[in-house]
């Protein structure tokens, strides 16, 4: 399939530049794959579309302030920006490094007690870097000096509001460089409300550059997704099997949860996944899916289209129709935007 088939027009003013408060006041579009019906609601009322005993699965990863600003050691006016993409092992990270003449061996001074050493080049502006922190571990140093890597399409720098709202309320395991945005809509109050009706569980997927890497090929079959680390526990697998046995629904909150579950399927899994979901993919775990409104021609929009494919429903056409409906009703798009529940 040609990537142009996943394009759509979006007015600039519908790109959400800031989060809504409270989180659960975001709009919710509900799509029914069987009837092709579209219903408008809010996240606070999402329980009205769920059944007693359904299982909602979230991603408990935590966003690191992965944007580090520094300068070449010993050289004035030599600003360098590092965006940590993926933790590899110990002090070693995969990172985008922006600046002039970035070469292996370069030492980047982030602070008097925190440095990055460029070890080798992977491709273009992507490098392997070693983080060296004095009198603290590297995560403490990243949290101390780093900035939240808010998406570039917000067109602004990080602000205090982002520290709270570009993080889920249940974030626990650090190492993501972007938020699992479908979960940003869930406040503590909404979670307490939901627990009275449905079951809640968690996977871990540490979001890396692979999740939001642009599709640069014309034929979507040729796109490759970078590896990301996931954890799917034995207790979650048991919970999923129990839910299925009761004829209730397993609902993934976000594309990261979707990819983790469809990688593990019916066994515990601790490792990496490069699963790329596109039209024709056969879902083995999911019965429902909560997600945001994604960028045109993105792998995430391709994934959502794949989930909407039914025997008598073209998933791509249905999703693009729903996006047109969202524009008409002034839904807010992308990371800080509104969301949809697909059943």
UniProtKB/Swiss-Prot annotation:
InterPro entries: QueA (IPR003699), QueA_dom1 (IPR042118), QueA_dom2 (IPR042119), QueA_sf (IPR036100). It comes from the Bacteria. The keyword S-adenosyl-L-methionine applies. Pfam families: Queuosine_synth. It is found in: Cytoplasm. GO terms for biological process: queuosine biosynthetic process; tRNA wobble guanine modification. Its main location: cytoplasm. One of its GO terms (molecular function) is S-adenosylmethionine:tRNA ribosyltransferase-isomerase activity. GO terms for cellular component: cytoplasm. The keyword DNA damage does not apply. Keywords: Cytoplasm, Queuosine biosynthesis, S-adenosyl-L-methionine, Transferase. It is an enzyme of class 2 (transferase). Transmembrane segments: none annotated. Its EC number is 2.4.99.17. Pathway: tRNA modification; tRNA-queuosine biosynthesis. It catalyses: 7-aminomethyl-7-carbaguanosine(34) in tRNA + S-adenosyl-L-methionine = epoxyqueuosine(34) in tRNA + adenine + L-methionine + 2 H(+). NCBIfam families: PRK00147.1 (NF001140), queA (TIGR00113). Belongs to the QueA family. Transfers and isomerizes the ribose moiety from AdoMet to the 7-aminomethyl group of 7-deazaguanine (preQ1-tRNA) to give epoxyqueuosine (oQ-tRNA). Monomer. This is S-adenosylmethionine:tRNA ribosyltransferase-isomerase.
């Amino acid at each position: 399939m040609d990537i142009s088939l996943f394009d759509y027009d979006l007015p600039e003013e519908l790109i959400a530049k800031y989060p809504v408060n409270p989180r659960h006041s975001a709009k919710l579009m509900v799509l029914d794959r069987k009837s092709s019906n579209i219903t408008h609601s809010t996240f606070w009322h999402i329980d009205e579309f769920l059944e007693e005993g359904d299982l909602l699965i979230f991603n408990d990863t935590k966003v690191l302030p992965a944007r580090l600003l520094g300068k070449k050691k010993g050289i004035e006016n030599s600003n360098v920006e590092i965006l940590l993409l993926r933790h590899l092992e110990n002090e070693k990270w995969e990172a985008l490094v922006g600046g002039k003449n970035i070469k292996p061996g370069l030492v980047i001074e982030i602070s008097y007690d925190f440095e990055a050493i460029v070890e080798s080049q992977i491709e273009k502006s992507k490098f392997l870097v070693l983080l060296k922190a004095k009198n603290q571990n590297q995560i403490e140093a990243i949290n101390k000096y780093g900035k939240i890597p808010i998406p570039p399409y917000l067109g602004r720098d990080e602000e205090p509001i982002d520290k709270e709202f570009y993080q889920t309320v249940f974030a626990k395991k650090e190492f993501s460089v972007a938020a699992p945005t479908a979960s940003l809509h869930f406040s503590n109050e909404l979670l307490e409300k939901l627990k009275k009706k449905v079951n809640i569980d968690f996977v871990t997927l540490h979001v890396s550059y692979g999740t939001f890497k642009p599709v640069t090929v014309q034929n979507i079959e040729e796109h490759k997704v970078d590896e990301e680390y996931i954890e799917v526990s034995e207790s979650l697998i048991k919970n999923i099997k129990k839910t299925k046995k009761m004829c209730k629904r397993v609902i993934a909150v976000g594309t990261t949860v979707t990819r983790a579950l469809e990688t593990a399927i019916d066994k515990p899994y601790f490792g990496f996944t490069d699963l790329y979901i596109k039209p024709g993919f056969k879902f083995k775990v999911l019965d429902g899916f909560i997600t945001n409104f994604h960028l045109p021609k993105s792998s995430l929009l391709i994934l959502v289209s794949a989930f909407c494919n039914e025997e008598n429903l073209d998933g791509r056409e249905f999703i693009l129709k729903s996006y047109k409906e969202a524009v008409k009703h002034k839904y807010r798009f992308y990371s800080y935007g509104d969301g949809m529940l697909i059943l």
